[in-house]
Each structure stands twice: as structure tokens, then as C-alpha cells.
Amino acid sequence: MSTQLDASQPSNDVASPAAYDPTQKQKSQAKTARIPIKVIPAERLKKPEWIRVRAAAPGSRFYDIKRILREHNLHTVCEEASCPNIGECFGKGTATFMIMGDKCTRRCPFCDVGHGRPDPLDAQEPENLARTIAALKLSYVVITSVDRDDLRDGGAAHFVECITKIRELSPITRIEVLVPDFRGRLDRALAILNAGPPDVMNHNLETVPRLYKQARPGSDYLHSLKLLAEFKALHPDVPTKSGLMLGLGETDEEILEVMRDMRAHNVDMITIGQYLQPSEHHLPVLRYVHPDTFAMFEREAYAMGFSHAAVGAMVRSSYHADEQAHAAGVN
């Protein structure tokens, strides 16, 4: 299979491992070649019948959303992370905006977002983002970002600027943020977020602690739980949320234990979906979880006291996020 690059969009060029340039965005093999954990290509498991991806139909809002994003120099995690639900979500006029650029300072080998030395923050981004959301008349948005370990606050102030500007230009819009872990700067980041807390606070644990070194190099399971718990302590009325992906080698009991940890740290909502390998250079899928197993996790989530659980093969962190938030009392 060959891949054609669009010369009109140089930001999507992929640097080769042999000619490493930290200012260029590395994806796929160029990205994973330099992580401490070696990704060994494996024979791909055959996708089962319950894995279905909906393509956007010509004439849907899919193309309108993409055009508006390009006009305002904005990125979505839907595109950058190759989300399988992009057709459905763009088609109905929803998107998860990715701020602070499209180059992440981490190299997680499950993720399709590019790695590289990030560009300076765009001072116009909060304004451009807010104007776009107002123009699209969106009632609910999710704002996420790449990891910005190069910034003293991890990007917390930029999140607050975006939240503030959105509320100024589109007061009807409810805002969920999906934040990085702010590792090494958590206290500073939480203090800054106090100035403009979101309507929903989301931070994904992604996988079980045993697999962190392999799947999330540079991250720490207990630190991520601490982030969620400390934010909740500061803002008890703001729902908190976290997500997991299945298929990296975890066991069902390990997933249930992580769910218990989430509840012990006052996480209100949970998403659980199937990991899909973006390329042969990313971590392989070691199992496709059967719908009956997803149904079991959903039952267990409600039994544990989660206010809402979105669980299924194609579920992603911000999939139907507006419906999840409404179920948790965000109006």
C-alpha cells in the first residue's frame, strides 16, 4: 500500500528516521523508531464482524467542517489521531479540537498524533477557536491538546484562554477538556485551571499500570489518578471523566481493577473502547474484545457508581461526549 503526501500541506510531512529533524513532525515509523520500547511488527489479527467504520457520505457536513478548520488554521484530534469515528462525528457537525499545535513532545506507540519539537503557541488560537465554534453554533465542544512538556505550565494557561474566549463568544456552548498529564508541573497547572474550569474535566488513563512502560513512556499511572482526584477536590461540582482502550495485552480483571481505582479517585464518567493499530509500526492489537465483554464492563461500571459509561468497540474518549455530559447533569 502506498501513501501519497499532499505537498500543499507541509505540516503533514513525515521525517524519515535517517534524517531526524526535531522541528519536523514524525509519524508512524519515524516516530516509534526513537522510543525506548521496540515495537516489533506482528501479523495483524483479522478484524471481527463487529468492527465497523462509517465513511462520511459526500455532501455531508464532513467536508464543510474540514474546510472551516483549515480556514481558521485549527486542528482536530479526530484527524491527527486517525479516529475511526471521524465520518460520523464530522457528518453531524461535532469535533474534538486539538490546541497548541500538532506536534507532541511524547512518543506513545499506540497513538497516531505526530511527534516533534512543538512550534511556539499561537496567540490567536483562542480567538480563532472561539469564532469557529460560534460560527458552527456548537452547543458542546471537546478541547484537547498534544503534550507540551516544553512549557512551564504544560499549556494550562492556554487551555484557560481558550475556555474564556469560547464562553465570551458562545455562552451557550458547554466545554469539556481532555488534558495531558501535566507531569512535573501539576500544582502549577491546577492553580491556573482554577481561573477558568471547564464544564467537564477529562484525562485518560488509557491502559492498565502493568502496560504503562510499553504503551505510555513518560507517563505515570498514579500521577494520572492524582490529577483527576486533585481537580475533583478543587471542583466537586465539575464531572470528571477518564477512558481506557482494550487490546494491548491487558486482562479483564486488570481493567476492572483500574475502574475501581477510578471510582476510588472520584472519577464520574468512563469510556472504554477497542484499540485499533494505526500502522504496522504502532503497538499491535493483541485481542479484539467481544461485544459481550464490553457489555460486562458497562454493567460493572454502573454497579461501581459511574454516572455514565460509554462502552463499546468503536467508543472513543469524546464519542457522543455531549450525551455523556448530559447524563452526568451538565446542561
Curated annotation (Swiss-Prot):
Pathway assignment reads:
Protein modification; protein lipoylation via endogenous pathway; protein N(6)-(lipoyl)lysine from octanoyl-[acyl-carrier-protein]: step 2/2
**Cofactor(s) required, per the database record:** [4Fe-4S] cluster
Origin superkingdom: Bacteria
Give the residues the record marks as binding [4Fe-4S] cluster 2.
C104, C108, C111
Q: Which reaction does it catalyse?
A: [[Fe-S] cluster scaffold protein carrying a second [4Fe-4S](2+) cluster] + N(6)-octanoyl-L-lysyl-[protein] + 2 oxidized [2Fe-2S]-[ferredoxin] + 2 S-adenosyl-L-methionine + 4 H(+) = [[Fe-S] cluster scaffold protein] + N(6)-[(R)-dihydrolipoyl]-L-lysyl-[protein] + 4 Fe(3+) + 2 hydrogen sulfide + 2 5'-deoxyadenosine + 2 L-methionine + 2 reduced [2Fe-2S]-[ferredoxin]
Q: PROSITE patterns recorded for this chain?
A: RADICAL_SAM
Q: Where is the Radical SAM core domain?
A: 89-307
Q: Which UniProt keywords apply?
A: 4Fe-4S, Cytoplasm, Iron, Iron-sulfur, Metal-binding, S-adenosyl-L-methionine, Transferase
Bias kind Polar residues: ranges: 1-14
- Compartments, record wording: Cytoplasm
Residues holding [4Fe-4S] cluster 1: C78, C83, C89, S318
The family database entries (CDD domains) matched by this protein are listed as: Radical_SAM
Return the Gene3D superfamilies for the record: Aldolase class I (3.20.20.70)
What's the top EC group for this one? transferase
Describe the family membership recorded for this protein in Swiss-Prot or TrEMBL: Belongs to the radical SAM superfamily. Lipoyl synthase family.
Q: What is this protein called?
A: Lipoyl synthase
